[in-house]
Amino acid sequence: MEQYTYRQYQESAETLRARLDGFRPDVLLILGSGLGALGDEVESPIVVPYGDVPHMKHSTAPDHKGQFVFGRLAGRNVVVMQGRLHTYEGWSFADVSYPVRVLRLLGAETLIVTNAAGAVNTGFSAGDIMLITDHIKLFGVSPLCGANVAEFGPRFPDMSQVYTPALREVARKAAEKLDIPLREGVYMYFPGPQYETPAEVRTARILGADAVGMSTVPEAIVAAHCGMKVLGFTLCTNMAAGVLDQPLDGDEVIAAGVAAGPRFTALVKSCLAEV
């Protein structure tokens, strides 16, 4: 199991700091499949490819550019990750969550994380936006396994409110103001890259999940460990396997994300102004 030392996180942060000319991000945004266009709206952008940052892995998923975009968005100092890392790409949980700790060292206090996922709740429809209230992770090791990096947080962190209640209320008010229907529910993590089987989807529903996907949870756990506030959104790009009698298609997921882009962008920007 690959682990990183506090010094390695510092080296990555120092490399980024040298490129930022004093800029300090307050909010980290991690954007999911088909949702990366928000990064193109950042004002006075400073773009840093992941490959320029020591110890940082690169993104190989379709539609994930693999770069940090620093700048102003909705009146806030932000850093947008255009493209995230996934364990199905062969990266460890430590790799996937590595950027969160690096950006925490640069000053980010809030994480806004988005993903594209399959709806398990039969009351949902493709295209719905879901506010994440909690998550389920039953597979694999934790991103906090191994020696604890005490500079970031305690050995046994509390996970009872990973998704900050006050930020969820901000999201509700923003959605109401924009007249954007907003679902709420539990996101369940599956490692992928294969989509879930109908039996797995039925199990997820029994356990209380409303959507299933392959990201978000590792980053949210590490952010909570770092003491960051977390706000999470899921775009239900499709109904999960077995809900409808049709196969799942990765291109359709990306297309659905692009189609929902304007609504999603408006909602996230409205939340940004209040977090």
Regions found by a protein language model. Give the residues of each.
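Short acidic/polar active-site loop segments enriched in Thr and Asp
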Residues: E109-T110, D210, K229
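Histidine/lysine/aspartate-rich catalytic loop segments that bind and position anionic ligands
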Residues: I136, G140, G146-P193
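Generic non-transmembrane alpha-helical segments
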Residues: T15, R19-G22, A166, V170-P181, ...
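Zn-dependent metallopeptidase/amidohydrolase metal-coordination segment
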Residues: M214-E252
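Active-site/ligand-binding-proximal alpha/beta "capping" segment
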Residues: A174-D210, V268, V275
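His/Asp/Glu-rich mid-to-C-terminal helical/loop segments that flank catalytic regions of hydrolases
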Residues: A240-V275
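Metabolite-binding pocket within alpha/beta catalytic cores that recognizes anionic/polar moieties
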Residues: M1-M159
